[in-house]
C-alpha cells in the first residue's frame, strides 16, 4: 500500500518524509482521488513555498513591538520607541513604508538605528531603491494616484542616495518566533508587497490558505493603514499591525501599532493606540508645502485622500 499524502501545520509530506518536488507531484497525482482538490492544492502550494522561502527564523522572543507605515512621521516613531521599551518589547519590527505622506523622511533613519529597529521593505522602499517612477502603492482610482504621486515625488526628492541604497538592502519578509509561534512578517501580504488585506474583504478560508501556503502560525502585515486582528479556527492569527504615520480614519489623532507576546493560552495580540505631537507634525508638513489634505488628516483623524481603495464597510465608517 502506498504512503498517504498528508498535510500538517501547512507542511506537505509523503509518508514520513519530505520528498523532492518532482516525486511529490507524482505522488500527489497517484493519490489525487484520495484527497479533496482544495487539500491537494493547499498541500502543493505549501510545499513549494517551503522550497522557495529560505528566510531564517529570528528569535525566540517573549514580546515584540510591530508597526508599519512610518510615512516620515519621526515624532510618532520617537514616541513608539519609548512606549515599546516601557512595555518590555525585546525587539521592534517595522513592516515598511518609511517615507510618504509626512515631512523630512531623512529624520526617520537615525531613529531606526537608535531603536535598533528591524525593518523590511514596503512598496516605497522597493520603488525608491530601484529608482521607479511611482510608489507601486496599488491604487486604481485617479484621485488616489494623484495624491500618491505628490507624496512619492516629495519623498524621492528628500531622501539621500545613501538612504535609498540602504532601503534596497532590506528584506521583503522576516520570520520571527514568539514563544512557540512562528510568525511571517510582510508588508502587504505573503503574495504581493502591495496587496491590501482589509478586515471586511479577507474571509477566514482565504486567510487559512495564506497561512498554509506560508507555513507559519501567524501573519503580520500592514499597507492598508487600518489595524485589525483575526484569530482563526485553526488557532492561528492574522494581524494588520497598524501604521504610525497617520491616524486610522476614525476621527482620533492617535496612531496605532501592535504588541505581540507569548501567552499560555496562545499568541497575545494587543492593538496599541499611540499619542504623539500631531500639532508639531502638522506645522512641519505645512512648512514643507505638503498638501493641506494631508495636514487635515493629521489634525482631525479623518482621511481626506486614498479613500477610493477602501471596501464598502471601511468606507462607510469614514467621514468623507
Predicted regions, residues:
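Active-site neighborhood of divalent metal-dependent phosphoester bond hydrolases
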Residues: 115-175, 197, 201-215
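Beta-strand-turn-beta hairpins that frame and shape the catalytic cleft
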Residues: 56-65, 176-184, 233-237, 266-268
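N-terminal active-site segment of His-dependent metallophosphoesterases
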Residues: 10-111, 115
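Anionic-ligand binding region
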Residues: 204-232, 236-241
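Acidic, His/Gly-rich catalytic cores of divalent-metal-dependent hydrolytic chemistry
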Residues: 40-48, 59, 231-320
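Active-site environment of divalent metal-dependent phosphoester hydrolases
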Residues: 71-78, 100-103, 124-130, 191, ...
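Active-site neighborhood of phospho(di)ester-bond hydrolases with catalytic His/Asp-centered motifs
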Residues: 67-68, 92-97, 101, 118-123, ...
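Metal-dependent catalytic neighborhoods of phosphoester/phosphodiester hydrolases
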Residues: 76, 98-115, 129-140, 196, ...
Amino acid at each position: 500500500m502506498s504512503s498517504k499524502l498528508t498535510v500538517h501545520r501547512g507542511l506537505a509530506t509523503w509518508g514520513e518524509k519530505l520528498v523532492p518536488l518532482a516525486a511529490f507531484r507524482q505522488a500527489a497525482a497517484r493519490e489525487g482521488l484520495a484527497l479533496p482538490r482544495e487539500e491537494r492544492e493547499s498541500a502543493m502550494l505549501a510545499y513549494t513555498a517551503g522550497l522557495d522561502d529560505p528566510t531564517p527564523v529570528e528569535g525566540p522572543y517573549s514580546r515584540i513591538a510591530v508597526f508599519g507605515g512610518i510615512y516620515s512621521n519621526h515624532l510618532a516613531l520617537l514616541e513608539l520607541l519609548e512606549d515599546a521599551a516601557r512595555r518590555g518589547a525585546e525587539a521592534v519590527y517595522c513592516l515598511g513604508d518609511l517615507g510618504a505622506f509626512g515631512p523630512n523622511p531623512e529624520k526617520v533613519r537615525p531613529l531606526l538605528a537608535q531603536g535598533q529597529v528591524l525593518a523590511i521593505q514596503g512598496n516605497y522602499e522597493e520603488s525608491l531603491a530601484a529608482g521607479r517612477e511611482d510608489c507601486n502603492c496599488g491604487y486604481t482610482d485617479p484621485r488616489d494616484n494623484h495624491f500618491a504621486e505628490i507624496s512619492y515625488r516629495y519623498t524621492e526628492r528628500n531622501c539621500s542616495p545613501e538612504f535609498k541604497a540602504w532601503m534596497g538592502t532590506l528584506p521583503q519578509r522576516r520570520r520571527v518566533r514568539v514563544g512557540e509561534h512562528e510568525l511571517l512578517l510582510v508588508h502587504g501580504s505573503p503574495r504581493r508587497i502591495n496587496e491590501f488585506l482589509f478586515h471586511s474583504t479577507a474571509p477566514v478560508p482565504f486567510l487559512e490558505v495564506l497561512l498554509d501556503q506560508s507555513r507559519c502560525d501567524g501573519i503580520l502585515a500592514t499597507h492598508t493603514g487600518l489595524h485589525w486582528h483575526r484569530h482563526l479556527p485553526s488557532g492561528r492569527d492574522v494581524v494588520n499591525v497598524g501604521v504610525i504615520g497617520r491616524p486610522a480614519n476614525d476621527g482620533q489623532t492617535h496612531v496605532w501599532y501592535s504588541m505581540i507576546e507569548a501567552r499560555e493560552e496562545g499568541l497575545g495580540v494587543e492593538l496599541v493606540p499611540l499619542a504623539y505631537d500631531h500639532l508639531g507634525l502638522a506645522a512641519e508638513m505645512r512648512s514643507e508645502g505638503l498638501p493641506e489634505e494631508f495636514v487635515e488628516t493629521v489634525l482631525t483623524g479623518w482621511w481626506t485622500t486614498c479613500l477610493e481603495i477602501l471596501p464598502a464597510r471601511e468606507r462607510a465608517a469614514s467621514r468623507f
